């Protein structure tokens, strides 16, 4: 039997989204898991706050080019990748200019909750799953961290229930600093 495969899906990861407790945990937990011999893949939304040049993000052409249907409209899925050098770990970024170009993660400049966060969350969660499918990478465990990832467990158990890639997967959802109402 090969290495256990763990998919980490988060809304924040240091060094990309700033130094928050959630971002630190989302960086350290995969690192420690990898040090124990597990095969790790990490996913993060490509928020407009993430500096592509500084973090050396580049598009993965073979994975990009899919469209996801959200609210009856096609939206282009762009996949980018970067490495956390000191950890020797790759991070995949789910991108779409319509949803993630803004310079704010979840709130508008005035501090109000973005009105399209629901669509952004749907796009991100579906984008992660579709990218894993396109990679053909069968995870043993999927660990979702933060409210923005909360649809992944439901999608895996309901929408993708018959998919052999996710047939025996264990799903963990970590609620972390759940300050947003309705989650």
Predicted stretch roles:
Residues 1-183:
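Catalytic cores of nucleotide-sugar-dependent glycosyltransferases that transfer UDP/GDP/TDP-activated
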